[in-house]
C-alpha cells in the first residue's frame, strides 16, 4: 500500500508465508514501512523500518531502522527509479541452538523501481545491500521483485520473488532464505 503527495510518499508492505511439507512447518515474515520527502531536483530524504523473521535462517525477529537519502533517476506518471544511501541500526534475535541476540550498525545502498498504471502489468523491485560498520566481514542483502498482470474485472495475477542473504549468520544458520509466490489479487 502506498500514498503519494507532491512532496511526501509513504509505503507499507506485509508478506507472510507459511509452508507445510509433510509435517514440517516453515514460517517467513517480511514487513516494512517507509517515508520519503522530495527535495529539489528529485533528491529526497528517507526513513524506513523493516521487520523480518525466517525459520529457514533461524531468525525470530530482525528489526532494521534506516535513515538516509537519495535521488529519483526516473520520476513520471508511470514509473519511478530511485537510488538511496544511508545508515541503519539492526537488532536481531536468532533461534539457533544457542539463542543469540545481536545489535549492529550498517551502511546501506539500495534501489527501487516501480512501473505502474501500465495497460496490463506492473513491476515492483526493491534491492538493498548492507555492509556492517560494527561487525567484521558481515554483509547482508534483501531483494524483492513483484510482477503483476491485469487479468480483468479488477483481478491481478502476481508473481513474487524474495531473497534474504546474510554472509555471517550465527551458529551455522543458513545464509539464504528465498520465497517464490504466485497470488491472485483484486482491487476494491
Where are these regions (language model features)?
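Detector for outer-membrane/organellar transmembrane beta-barrel domains
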Residues: 66, 78-131
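Outer-membrane beta-barrel "beta-signal"
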Residues: 176-188
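Solvent-exposed loop/turn segments connecting transmembrane beta-strands
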Residues: 4, 20-27, 53-61, 96-101, ...
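Transmembrane beta-barrel strands of outer-membrane/channel proteins
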Residues: 12-18, 31-33, 47-51, 67, ...
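Membrane-embedded beta-strand positions in outer-membrane beta-barrel channels/transporters
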Residues: 30-32, 62, 66-68, 106-110, ...
Amino acid at each position: 500500500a502506498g500514498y503519494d503527495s507532491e512532496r511526501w510518499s509513504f509505503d507499507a508492505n506485509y508478506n507472510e508465508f507459511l509452508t507445510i511439507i509433510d509435517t514440517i512447518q516453515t514460517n517467513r515474515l517480511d514487513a516494512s514501512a517507509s517515508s520519503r520527502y522530495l527535495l529539489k531536483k528529485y533528491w529526497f530524504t528517507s526513513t524506513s523500518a523493516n521487520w523480518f523473521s525466517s525459520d529457514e535462517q533461524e531468525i525470530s525477529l530482525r528489526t532494521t531502522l534506516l535513515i538516509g537519502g537519495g535521488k529519483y533517476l526516473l520520476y513520471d506518471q508511470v514509473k519511478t527509479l530511485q537510488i538511496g544511501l544511508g545508515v541503519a541500526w539492526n537488532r536481531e534475535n536468532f533461534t539457533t541452538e544457542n539463542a543469540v541476540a545481536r545489535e549492529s550498525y550498517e551502511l546501506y545502498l539500495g534501489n527501487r523501481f516501480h512501473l505502474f498504471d501500465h495497460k496490463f502489468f506492473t513491476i515492483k523491485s526493491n534491492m538493498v545491500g548492507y555492509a556492517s560498520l560494527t561487525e567484521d566481514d558481515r554483509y547482508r542483502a534483501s531483494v524483492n521483485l513483484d510482477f503483476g498482470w491485469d487479468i480483468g474485472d479488477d483481478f491481478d495475477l502476481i508473481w513474487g520473488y524474495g531473497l534474504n542473504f546474510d554472509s555471517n549468520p550465527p551458529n551455522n544458520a543458513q545464509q539464504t532464505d528465498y520465497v517464490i509466490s504466485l497470488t491472485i489479487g483484486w482491487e476494491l
